[in-house]
C-alpha cells in the first residue's frame, strides 16, 4: 500500500486541513465519526482510500494526519467540531503559548519543546504504514508557527525519513493583503529551509484565491472557509490518483520526477478549473478543451504571478471525472499551438497528464457547482520568481533599517541567519533567471562536438 501522511502546521495549515478532510470524507463516504457504511471488507487494508485513512479493527476509519499548533484555539475547534470523533486525540497537538508571528519562536524557543512530541506521533503513524511514500505538509510561511515550526519539522523529517518525498502546500504572503508586518522576514527565513527540505512546494496565496472566488463564484466578501474549500479541491485533485483508480494514475514521487528539473527549482503554480457557481454551471458545457484552456488563464492562478512573464518548464494536468485520453490529447495539442504558453527550449514535451474516473465531489452548501469533470494543473514556471522578488524587496526595505530584528535576536537567532537566508533567495532568483534564459547563445560552440 502506498500511504501518505498529512501534517498540518499552524493556523493556516490546520484550517486548510479541516476543509481537506471534510472533502476527503465526503469523497469516500466516510461519516464524521469514521464509520464507512459502503466498506464491506472490515480490516482489509487494500482499498485505495487506505492511502489516507487507516482502518481500525472496529471498522472505523482514522485519517493519517497530524494537526499541530503552538496555541490551542484552532486545534480546540477541531477537538469540539463536527469531526471530533474522526481524529485520534493524540493526533491533535497544541501548545500553550503561540509563536506570535515570530519565526525564531516557532523554530528555536517554543517549537523546540513540541517538535519531539510531534515526531513521536508521526513515527507512530509511519509504523502503521506498510509502504509509506511520503508526507504532505500544509502550512503558511507568513506567520510564526507555520514558518518556524514548519521549517524545523521538515528539517527533522529529512533526517528521520531521508528518502521519503515531502510535498508542501505552502501559503505565501500576498502582494497587497497582509496579516502581519514581519511576513517578509518569516517567509524568507522559512523558504531558506524549504529549499533544502521539500521536494515539491505548491505555492498558494490568499489574494489570488480571493480574486478567484470573487470573480467566478460571485461571493462579495469571501471568508477563509470559502478559500480553504477551494484549496481543498486542489489538494483533492492532486491526491485523487493516490485514493481512487483511474486510467493514468500518478504517484507522489512521480510529481517530483516530472515537475522538478533541478532540485532547487521545485516551487510550483497550481490552478483548478472549473471554479464556477451553481447558477452559471447550469448554462455551460465545460468540455475537456474548455476547462483545459481555463487552467492556463492567468486569472485562475492560485498565486499572484503572471505565467506570461515566464516560461513553463514542466506541467502536470490532473483530470478527474468523465474524461477520456482522446479528449485530453486533443486539448493538449490545442494548448501547444498557442503562442501565449511558452516552454523553455530544453523542455520539448512538457506535459504530463493524469486521468481519474472519480468525478469531483462538492461540499453540500458550499460555493462550487457539482460538475462532471474537472482539471487541476501544477506547473513549474520561471514566472514564480516574481513571488520571491516581491518578498525579497519587502525584506530588504525592512532589513536595511534592521526593523523588528531585535524580536528575532531576542529569541536566540543570529543576525547572520537573516543575511544567509536572503543570499540563498537571491541565488534562487538567479537560478530561475538562468533556467529561463535562452540556451540559443550556447549553440554556437556545441555544433562542433560530434556525437
UniProtKB/Swiss-Prot annotation:
Pfam families: Tubulin (PF00091), Tubulin_C (PF03953)
InterPro entries, A to Z: Alpha_tubulin, Tub_FtsZ_C, Tubulin, Tubulin/FtsZ-like_C, Tubulin/FtsZ_2-layer-sand-dom, Tubulin/FtsZ_GTPase_sf, Tubulin_C, Tubulin_CS
Keywords per UniProt: Acetylation, Cytoplasm, Cytoskeleton, GTP-binding, Hydrolase, Magnesium, Metal-binding, Microtubule, Nucleotide-binding
Gene Ontology CC: one annotated term: microtubule
GO molecular function: GTP binding; hydrolase activity; metal ion binding; structural constituent of cytoskeleton
PTM entry text: Undergoes a tyrosination/detyrosination cycle, the cyclic removal and re-addition of a C-terminal tyrosine residue by the enzymes tubulin tyrosine carboxypeptidase (TTCP) and tubulin tyrosine ligase (TTL), respectively.
Keyword ATP-binding: no
Main location: cytoplasm
Site (Involved in polymerization): 451
Subcellular location: Cytoplasm, Cytoskeleton
EC class: hydrolase
Catalytic residues, chain numbering: 254
Needed cofactors: Mg(2+)
Name assigned to this protein: Tubulin alpha chain
Organism phylogeny: Eukaryota, Discoba, Euglenozoa, Kinetoplastea, Metakinetoplastina
Amino acid at each position: 500500500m502506498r500511504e501518505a501522511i498529512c501534517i498540518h502546521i499552524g493556523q493556516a495549515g490546520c484550517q486548510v486541513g479541516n476543509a481537506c478532510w471534510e472533502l476527503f470524507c465526503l469523497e469516500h463516504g466516510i461519516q464524521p465519526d469514521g464509520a464507512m457504511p459502503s466498506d464491506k471488507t472490515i480490516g482489509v487494508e487494500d482499498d485505495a482510500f487506505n492511502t489516507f485513512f487507516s482502518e481500525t479493527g472496529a471498522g472505523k476509519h482514522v485519517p493519517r494526519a497530524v494537526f499541530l499548533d503552538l496555541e490551542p484555539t484552532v486545534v480546540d475547534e477541531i477537538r469540539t467540531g463536527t469531526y471530533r470523533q474522526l481524529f485520534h486525540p493524540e493526533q491533535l497537538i497544541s501548545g500553550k503559548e503561540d509563536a506570535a508571528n515570530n519565526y525564531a519562536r516557532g523554530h528555536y524557543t517554543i517549537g523546540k519543546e513540541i517538535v519531539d512530541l510531534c515526531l513521536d506521533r508521526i513515527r507512530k503513524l509511519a509504523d502503521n504504514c506498510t509502504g509509506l511514500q511520503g508526507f504532505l505538509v500544509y502550512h503558511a510561511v507568513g506567520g510564526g508557527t507555520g514558518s518556524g515550526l514548519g521549517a524545523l519539522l521538515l528539517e527533522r523529517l529529512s533526517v528521520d525519513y531521508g528518502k521519503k518525498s515531502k510535498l508542501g502546500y505552502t501559503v505565501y504572503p500576498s502582494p497587497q493583503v497582509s496579516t502581519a508586518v514581519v511576513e517578509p522576514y518569516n517567509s524568507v527565513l522559512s523558504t531558506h529551509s524549504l529549499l533544502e527540505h521539500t521536494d515539491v512546494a505548491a505555492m498558494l496565496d490568499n489574494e489570488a484565491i480571493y480574486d478567484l472566488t470573487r470573480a467566478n463564484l460571485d461571493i462579495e466578501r469571501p471568508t477563509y472557509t470559502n478559500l480553504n474549500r477551494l484549496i481543498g479541491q486542489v489538494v483533492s485533485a492532486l491526491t485523487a490518483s493516490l485514493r481512487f483508480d483511474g486510467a493514468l494514475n500518478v504517484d507522489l514521487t512521480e510529481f517530483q520526477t516530472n515537475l522538478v528539473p533541478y532540485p532547487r527549482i521545485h516551487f510550483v503554480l497550481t490552478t483548478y478549473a472549473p471554479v464556477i457557481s451553481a447558477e452559471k454551471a447550469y448554462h455551460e458545457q465545460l468540455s475537456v478543451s474548455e476547462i483545459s484552456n481555463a487552467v492556463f488563464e492567468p486569472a485562475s492562478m492560485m498565486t499572484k504571478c503572471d505565467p506570461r512573464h515566464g516560461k513553463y518548464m514542466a506541467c502536470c494536468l490532473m483530470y478527474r471525472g468523465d474524461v477520456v485520453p482522446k479528449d485530453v490529447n486533443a486539448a493538449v495539442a490545442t494548448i501547444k499551438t498557442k503562442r501565449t504558453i511558452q516552454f523553455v527550449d530544453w523542455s520539448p514535451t512538457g506535459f504530463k497528464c493524469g486521468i481519474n474516473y472519480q468525478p469531483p465531489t462538492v461540499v453540500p452548501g458550499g460555493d462550487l457547482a457539482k460538475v462532471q469533470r474537472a482539471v487541476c494543473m501544477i506547473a513549474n514556471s520561471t514566472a514564480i520568481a516574481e513571488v520571491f522578488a516581491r518578498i525579497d524587496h519587502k525584506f530588504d526595505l525592512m532589513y536595511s533599517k534592521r526593523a523588528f530584528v531585535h524580536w528575532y535576536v531576542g529569541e536566540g537567532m543570529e543576525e547572520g541567519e537573516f543575511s544567509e537566508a536572503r543570499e540563498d533567495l537571491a541565488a534562487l532568483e538567479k537560478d530561475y533567471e538562468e533556467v529561463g534564459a535562452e540556451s540559443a547563445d550556447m549553440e554556437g560552440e556545441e555544433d562542433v562536438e560530434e556525437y
